[in-house]
């Protein structure tokens, strides 16, 4: 039997147990989870690409089929209402026969408006979980997305099953293939558009299948944190390349970033090497029992040391941190949970009731503050950038006297650096899925 199929049985058992626990606690008969609906573009007859409800794809890898429903109570075999219309305009999904199908009682739905007859008749004690509240109300649901239920699932989503970990390994494998192709295209003089196409070709996934919009940036564009344009024309001179791009496997995401210097020599290349070394060391700092926020604080110490070593800031590292200069050059968080969503839910939670884990003082904008525990998956993605707007703000402060502005100007044509790996925390070890696949 396929490895995923074996692991999936334990995954479903875990989801059933979680469902049973929260339904008993909240006095619910069960949950009705909606995959979602296609969204029509304004004043048009075309639709936006469909994105499935993450609570739905936690149960099964059906990512591209709207109007599906799961009815589950944690004790009985889950019921899957699978949308399969008669349609000569579009490709109709095949009847489910994959490894996961045997774990569901499957009923086929021909038309979305016929679903009511397949749902529980009395919905008073069933909770609707999904985006389309007006649909839920029309169907007779009075309990919709109850906060205690969502908090419970979001908290426990951080603890990955073995099936989920295997899916994340596969997502990394696909993404690494794309990264290697993108890297080669950059060193062959390709444009951002060329690099993006090479990435998609190597992953065998379309742009809409990517878990997020790829960031493919050359030169100064590397300073734009979420740069999602693709210049079709190659620059006259290639200086640097930053790629932040992932892949999808069964609904689970990879999220990987690399930065390259075109000449592979000189001070920016050395800066990339220094950031890479810091990133690897920070990754080894993921220890069960520690706060992820503390690792973010340590990242600022590492960035400060690099700013000092390269004479970008003419101060010792300790004083750079004390003066909060690092936030100009490293303005985002160290990373986040990874799973069904790129920025997976539950990163701020202190318990399953929804209490929040406070961020470290002076670092309010993090995506993860949680206690690190085994079977959790994190990204580690330190950065160092030369962003005009932030540098302009810095120039208006007393700290401007400590900045080597000539050095800053020399680095501006390169934009910035970000390095990112995806790491599993085990009880007594770490598994860097990204570097295990030989992506330097």
UniProtKB/Swiss-Prot annotation:
CDD domains: Prolidase. InterPro entries: Creatin/AminoP/Spt16_N, Creatinase/aminopeptidase-like, PepQ_N, Pept_M24, Peptidase_M24B_aminopep-P_CS, X-Pro_dipept-like, X_Pro_dipept. Gene3D superfamilies: Creatinase/methionine aminopeptidase superfamily, Creatinase/prolidase N-terminal domain. Mn(2+) 1 binds at residues 255, 336, 381, 420. Its cofactor is Mn(2+). GO terms for cellular component: cytosol. The keyword Repressor does not apply. Binds 2 manganese ions per subunit. Keywords: Dipeptidase, Hydrolase, Manganese, Metal-binding, Metalloprotease, Protease. GO terms for biological process: proteolysis. The keyword Hydrolase applies. Belongs to the peptidase M24B family. Bacterial-type prolidase subfamily. NCBIfam families: PRK13607.1. Splits dipeptides with a prolyl residue in the C-terminal position. This is Xaa-Pro dipeptidase. It comes from Pseudoalteromonas translucida (strain TAC 125). The lineage of its organism: Bacteria, Pseudomonadati, Pseudomonadota, Gammaproteobacteria, Alteromonadales.
């Amino acid at each position: 039997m396929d490895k995923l199929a074996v692991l999936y049985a334990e995954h479903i058992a875990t989801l059933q147990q979680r469902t049973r626990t929260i339904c008993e606690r909240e006095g619910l008969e069960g949950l009705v989870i909606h995959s979602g609906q296609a969204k029509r573009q304004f004043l048009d007859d075309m639709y936006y690409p469909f994105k499935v409800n993450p609570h739905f794809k936690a149960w099964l890898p059906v990512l591209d089929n709207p109007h599906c429903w799961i009815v589950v109570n944690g004790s009985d075999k889950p019921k899957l209402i699978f949308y399969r219309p008669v349609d000569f305009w579009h490709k109709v999904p095949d009847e489910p026969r994959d490894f996961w199908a045997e774990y569901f009682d499957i009923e086929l739905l021909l038309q979305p408006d016929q679903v009511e007859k397949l749902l529980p008749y009395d919905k008073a004690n069933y909770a609707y979980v999904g985006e389309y509240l007006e649909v839920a109300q029309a169907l007779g649901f009075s309990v919709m997305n109850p906060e205690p239920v969502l908090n419970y699932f979001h908290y426990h989503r951080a603890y990955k099953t073995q099936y989920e970990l295997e899916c994340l390994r596969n997502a990394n494998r696909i993404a690494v293939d794309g990264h290697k192709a993108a890297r080669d295209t950059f060193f062959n003089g390709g444009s951002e558009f060329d690099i993006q196409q090479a990435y998609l070709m190597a992953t065998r996934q379309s742009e809409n299948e990517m878990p997020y919009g790829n960031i493919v940036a050359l030169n100064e564009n590397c300073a734009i944190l979420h740069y999602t344009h693709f210049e079709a024309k190659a620059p006259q001179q290639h200086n640097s390349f930053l790629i932040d791009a992932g892949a999808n496997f069964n609904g689970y995401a990879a999220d990987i970033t690399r930065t390259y210097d075109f000449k592979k020599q000189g001070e920016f290349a050395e800066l990339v090497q220094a950031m890479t070394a810091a990133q690897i060391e920070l990754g080894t700092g993921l220890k069960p029992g520690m706060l992820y926020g503390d690792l973010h604080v340590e990242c600022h110490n590492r960035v400060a040391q690099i700013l000092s070593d390269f004479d970008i800031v003419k101060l010792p590292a300790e004083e750079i941190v004390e003066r909060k200069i690092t936030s100009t050059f490293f303005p985002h968080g160290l990373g986040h949970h990874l799973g069904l969503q790129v920025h997976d839910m539950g990163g701020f939670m202190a318990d399953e009731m929804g209490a929040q884990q406070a961020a470290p003082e002076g670092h309010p904008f993090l995506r993860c503050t949680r206690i690190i525990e085994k079977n959790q998956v994190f990204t580690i993605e330190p950065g160092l950038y030369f962003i005009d707007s932030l540098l302009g703000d810095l120039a208006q402060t007393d700290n401007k006297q400590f900045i080597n502005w000539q050095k800053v100007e020399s680095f501006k044509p390169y934009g910035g650096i970000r390095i990112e790996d995806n790491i599993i925390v085990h009880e007594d070890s770490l598994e860097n899925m990204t570097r295990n696949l030989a992506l330097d």
